[in-house]
A protein has these predicted regions:
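Helical "substrate-binding/catalytic lid" subdomain
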Residues: 73-169, 173-194
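Rossmann-fold dinucleotide-binding core
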Residues: 2-82
Length: 195
């Protein structure tokens, strides 16, 4: 497993104390997905060491992403991607409960989510650019739409007798963002209530 960013910094210090160079890494796939062209592995640490080891690392996966010389960068990005993954899993499993409650096909649900994921990935890339720029002017999706949608998800869960923890959390955060005046901004303005 990947350690924390501080664990990586400590490992670099220990390596340097004995004259070694340290690279930190974070595998972004399950074990059975290793060694594939699209297997993503995050790496950080000394660039010269990364360049020397690039060929060996490529055996483990085809998408080796070097994040710079900060030893904790790979662990930090791993925590960020895990935040996304676990949020997506919570949403997916809640959606499976909604699907079950209405007697619909879970296979169809999984197929729909898989088909829409590449487009949603592009949408999230746009949201990252919005946050990075600091310009939350609406260009794709105003936050207010998500306030209404998450409230509806929470209401439907309760009406169906489902556990409503996941949509309740989302509804609370989006409502908080709207109450703070961000409803007419890009969806990514939600980050302002998390800062």
């Amino acid at each position: 497993t990947t350690g924390s960013p501080q664990d990586a910094r400590n490992a670099q210090d220990r390596a340097a104390a004995v004259g070694a160079v340290y690279l930190d890494g974070a595998i972004q796939v399950a074990p059975e997905q290793m060694g594939q062209p699209d297997t993503t592995i995050l790496v950080s640490g000394a660039q010269a060491a990364f360049e020397r080891g690039r060929g060996v690392l490529a055996v483990f996966g085809g998408n080796i992403v070097y994040l710079g010389d900060k030893p904790g960068a790979a662990a930090t990005m791993d925590m960020a991607t895990l935040s996304y993954v676990y949020g997506a899993v919570l949403g997916f499993v809640h959606g499976a409960r909604v699907t079950e409650a209405e007697g619909l096909s879970l296979k169809a649900y999984g197929d729909i989510v898989a088909a829409m994921s590449p487009s949603y990935g592009q949408f999230l890339r746009h949201q990252a650019a919005v946050i990075d720029s600091g310009d939350f002017t609406v260009s794709q999706s105003p936050l207010s739409i998500s306030v209404e949608a998450t409230q509806r998800l929470e209401r439907i869960a309760r009406e169906s007798g489902l556990d409503a923890q996941v949509p309740a959390l989302a509804a609370r955060l989006f409502r908080q963002a709207q109450d703070a005046g961000h409803g007419r901004e890009e969806l990514a303005a939600l980050i302002k209530v998390l800062r």
